[in-house]
Amino acid sequence: MLFGKNRSCFALKMYEKDLEVVDEYKYLGVTVVTGDSITFSTSRPLRHFRSAANTLLSAPVKSSETVTVKLLYTICIPNLTYACEALNYSSRQFHDLNVAINDCLRKVFNYNRWESVRFLRQELGYPSLTEIFRSRSRKFHDCMHLLQNDTLNLLNSLSFDEE
């Protein structure tokens, strides 16, 4: 399978079989998208998040708002944060992820679309998606040196020098 934006005029072969040219490739649950730089798709995580959230929010027996938010953060949000340590979403993609979470919180507390749920989320003690991504990324980079791998340690030091 050939992955990339530039497609060659001639067929590439491996083990005497033609390599297939693709625009997206799913690897370890993450969809990598073809382009000038490495990008990732949010469509699959958003679909799984919304599916889990709809199941939770449309249950025939309603639990308390506090329990529902706890379940939302325990069951649904991990669909959005899977592999977040390694992913670099665009600001538009990150905005879409935040909107999905905020819409669910609005549904739980019967807020209107124009009402902010930031203060509500903070009062309940739940982190924002930005805080979750930052915390997990920092923890990932802090544990990298334990691997005793010179290449990974070099890459880790370069990635934090840029910040």
Where are these regions (language model features)?
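Short, conserved micro-motifs composed of acidic
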Residues: 1-24
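A glycine-rich phosphate-binding loop feature that marks nucleotide/adenosyl-phosphate handling sites
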Residues: 1-6, 93-97, 118-126
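Short helix/loop capping segments that flank catalytic or ligand/cofactor-binding pockets
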Residues: 11, 35-36, 141
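Basic, alpha-helical interaction scaffolds
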Residues: 16-88
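Amphipathic alpha-helical interaction motifs in eukaryotic regulatory proteins
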Residues: 50, 57, 77, 105-106, ...
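Short amphipathic alpha-helical coiled-coil/interface segments
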Residues: 76, 97-108, 137
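Short, flexible/disordered secondary-structure transition segments
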Residues: 82, 86-87, 94, 115, ...
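Acidic catalytic cores of enzymes that act on phosphate-bearing nucleotides/polynucleotides
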Residues: 110-163
